[in-house]
Curated annotation (Swiss-Prot):
It comes from the Viruses. Forms the penton at the fivefold vertices of the icosahedral capsid. Together with the minor capsid proteins (p17, p49, and M1249L), forms a complicated network immediately below the outer capsid shell, stabilizing the whole capsid. Induction: Expressed in the late phase of the viral replicative cycle. This is Penton protein H240R. It is found in: Virion. GO terms for cellular component: virion component. Keywords: Late protein, Virion. The keyword Cell wall biogenesis/degradation does not apply. Belongs to the asfivirus H240R family.
Length: 240
């Protein structure tokens, strides 16, 4: 008895190529109104105006790599020994479905060794700087990094502040609390090209001599020693 054989053509596999994208998450370009950190990534754009520019698109992401970077001492820490186990963990909120789960429900993507650099900064050295996703991430548009140690989330001193100009004394006054600034610290002022130093810190107010006339509405103060820049590298799959 003859058997009927139905032949089917195998579906051809889609060829794919890998694309590589670098980006630098700069705390001075975080999204407005999002504290402590949240970033918007713009494909084929430039970094600036609260946007992190990326050379290409971040779709079908299969691997993420992080490189060493520095952070200021968190508000909860005073000495290097305050970092429990000498480790800090980094978790990206938008990628929570694919993250390492640890004790007490903590999740993270990267683990770092904490290395002292100065009295107010430490360097984070990745223990394993690559994270491979089990399933490709369809698109990365926003990233919200959260730092932990075994005691809980870490908060950092502000690196960008809005200012008030006293028209009588011609000083810039910053009525803020929990800052880590001292007399002589260098700061940058938007709308004014010269580097300034803090003249006085008193009663939770920082005074900076203002030489040219400045408008309070247009001024922001940038504090270099509190700046955090996270260098990332992404590998994506693209169908061709």
């Amino acid at each position: 008895m003859a058997a009927n054989i139905i032949a089917t053509r195998a579906t051809p596999k889609m060829a794919s190529k890998k694309e590589h994208q670098y980006c630098l998450l700069d705390s001075q370009e975080k999204r407005d109104g999002h504290y402590p950190f949240s970033f918007e990534l713009k494909p084929y754009g430039q970094t600036g105006a609260n946007i992190i520019g990326v050379q290409g698109s971040l779709t079908h992401v299969i691997k993420m790599t992080v490189f060493p970077f520095m952070i200021p001492f968190p508000l909860q820490k005073i000495h290097i020994d305050d970092f429990i186990g000498g480790r800090v963990y980094l978790f990206f909120k938008e990628l929570d479905v694919q993250a390492i789960s640890d004790v007490n429900g903590m999740q993270y993507h990267f683990e770092f060794k904490v290395v002292p650099v100065s009295s107010n900064q430490v360097e984070l050295l990745p223990v394993n700087n690559k994270y491979k996703f089990t399933y490709a991430i369809p698109e990365v548009q926003y990233l919200t990094p959260i730092f932990y140690d075994l005691s809980g989330p870490l908060n950092f001193p502000l690196d960008t502040l809005s200012v008030h100009v006293d028209s009588l004394t011609k000083h810039i006054q910053l009525p803020i609390q929990n800052h880590n600034l001292t007399t002589g610290d260098r700061v940058f002022i938007s709308g004014y090209k010269h580097l300034q130093t803090i003249e006085l810190c008193k009663n939770n107010k920082i005074f900076i001599k203002c030489i040219p006339p400045l408008s309070s509405e247009k001024i922001k103060l940038y504090i270099p020693k509190n700046r955090i820049r996270i260098p990332l590298y992404f590998k994506s799959l693209k169908n061709v």
